[in-house]
Amino acid sequence: MSANEQWDIVSGVGITALAVAVARARESRRDDRLIDDPYAEPLIRAAQPPVPMSGDGGEAGALWHEMTDYVSVRSRFFDEWFARACAAGTRQAVVLASGLDTRAFRLEWPEGFRVFEIDQPKVLEFKDGTLAAEGVRASCERHAVAVDLRDDWASALVKAGFDPALPTAWLAEGLLPYLPPEAEANLLATVHDLSARGSRIAIESIALARSALLGADLDDTAREWGIDLKGLFSLEDRPDPGDVLAQRGWRVHRDPVGDLAAGFRRPLSDRAQQLGAAGEMVTAQRD
């Protein structure tokens, strides 16, 4: 991802958010689904991608199936993490690079809970307009913060009503693989600075699995979508995000993706395991 790149939902990093929505829609049709996202399908229809993203047929179709399993395990884990944060008394959350995330609409939140979604203006405009046209209303006090995470997003967040004096639940799902090392370091530093005692964060970390992103299977999907997927990822070495938070005094816990999949009775394929084996969900709390 280039330093000044902008995108909508069918270009650049935005199309990966659309792909995740496709995975959530596929999962929601299963009888044994791990998540239920009734809003993913309307978002896919409205996006009208330049090429079909059906996820059916051929080698790319097999990769879609495996991606759906991975996304479902990841989504279920973070859904449950939010539920625990709410039970602990947290009353505001920030979804970093929210994309087409619909948790502000599909999850149950305590009365008065505030969810701040940060993303590119075009991405938020598309999601807001589509769901409004469907008559969908948020199940919390939702604030869309249209700002690039490479800009002064902290000021925009506070201006939108975020209270840094209150404990916060931060989510970085499907974000860090796209950030250069310096941008990732700045993001974690800003989160720390804005986090009151009792705040927590959940991060999808695949730092050790970055080389697996360069496999031929990704080439198949890139050709199907007509986009340079490899060019979107930042493959430079960087410190582990859990270690960075621990050095700042956060209490860190790690859940390997394979263990989570087994716990949800959704074992990943050998190929998905190869990608996810070195990946983990990192959660941390600032005491």
From Swiss-Prot:
InterPro entries: Ppm1/Ppm2/Tcmp, SAM-dependent_MTases_sf, SAM_mthyl_Trfase_ML2640-like. It is an enzyme of class 2 (transferase). Keywords: Methyltransferase, S-adenosyl-L-methionine, Transferase. GO terms for biological process: methylation. Gene3D superfamilies: Vaccinia Virus protein VP39. GO terms for molecular function: methyltransferase activity. It comes from the Bacteria. It holds the Pfam family LCM. S-adenosyl-L-methionine binds at D119, D148, L149. Its EC number is 2.1.1.-. Disulfide bonds: none annotated. PANTHER family: S-ADENOSYL-L-METHIONINE-DEPENDENT METHYLTRANSFERASE YKTD-RELATED, S-ADENOSYL-L-METHIONINE-DEPENDENT METHYLTRANSFERASES SUPERFAMILY PROTEIN. Exhibits S-adenosyl-L-methionine-dependent methyltransferase activity. Belongs to the UPF0677 family. This is Putative S-adenosyl-L-methionine-dependent methyltransferase SACE_1742. It comes from Saccharopolyspora erythraea (strain ATCC 11635 / DSM 40517 / JCM 4748 / NBRC 13426 / NCIMB 8594 / NRRL 2338). The lineage of its organism: Bacteria, Bacillati, Actinomycetota, Actinomycetes, Pseudonocardiales.
